[in-house]
Amino acid sequence: YDALPNSLPRVGGIITSVVQTPLSHVNLRAIQDNVPNAYIANPLSNDAIASLLNGYIYYKVESDQYEIREATLAEVNDWYEDLRPTETQYPIRNLSITEIIPLDDITFDMSSSFGAKCSNLATMRSFGFPEGTIPNGFGIPFYFYDEFMQYNNFYEEAQVIMDNPAFQNDINFRNERLEDFRRSIKDAPMPQWMLDELQAMHDAFPSETPVRVRSSTNNEDLPGFSGAGLYTSKTQYPDEGHISKSVKQVYASMWNFRAYEERDFYRIDHFGAAMGLLCHPNFQGEQSNGVGISID
């Protein structure tokens, strides 16, 4: 690539041949993952870099210079083990809220049930911005994802998938098997009560409104772990039928290859991970978009 995709999986270092923006998804991922990242003009024309292709490298980036050389396998293994937590991490997952709630009724401390993205945006609606600055909408709690997964026995299926030695040791097999699993999630049925509640939420939006269904998990937008680009958001257009289509597409993204690899590296319990949803009118005619990072 000249410009790396936002869906970049875990890597040991990044070089781009085009200038990056400080708040690009790629740069945010590099900061979060503590990996070196630099723009280097015409890197493959540089023999000192090109000669290292397909081998282990030592790569260090400072504000005005970089160092790159061949590395030993021991150096590589030591580097990654130093980055990983030593114990399994269990993200907070509160399933006590069992209903879809308007954003104006969701508070900051309800992130344990809706995810930080949803609760943060809901809280911003109380900041006094001009009407329309922060979109109105609804939050769908983790409870819905958990009930959907249990209804289809997907937790058990995921465990069987993960226990397969080929899945654990073959990255291509793992990628393909996760793709199959996501397809199963998208095609799976929902209990009728869930379909009814999703339809009631959808009907509450003005007629013909495209609704943006955004991921809001308990393992992104957290202190020290942004999760930028790991999960997928979808827009439900008026001619697409029941909004469960988009909901299931976002639920399936919990098992994106890049998301699975990131959780696995950080030893985050896959079955404690939960998907909340932030639903609001889709932004129309936007001139640009990006990521905002506060000083705290």
What are these regions (language model features)?
Residues 12-16, 113, 280:
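Glycine- and other small-residue-rich loops at beta-strand/loop junctions that grip anionic moieties
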Residues 28-34, 126-128, 295:
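Alpha-helix C-terminal capping segments
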Residues 1-43:
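Extracellular/luminal Protease-associated
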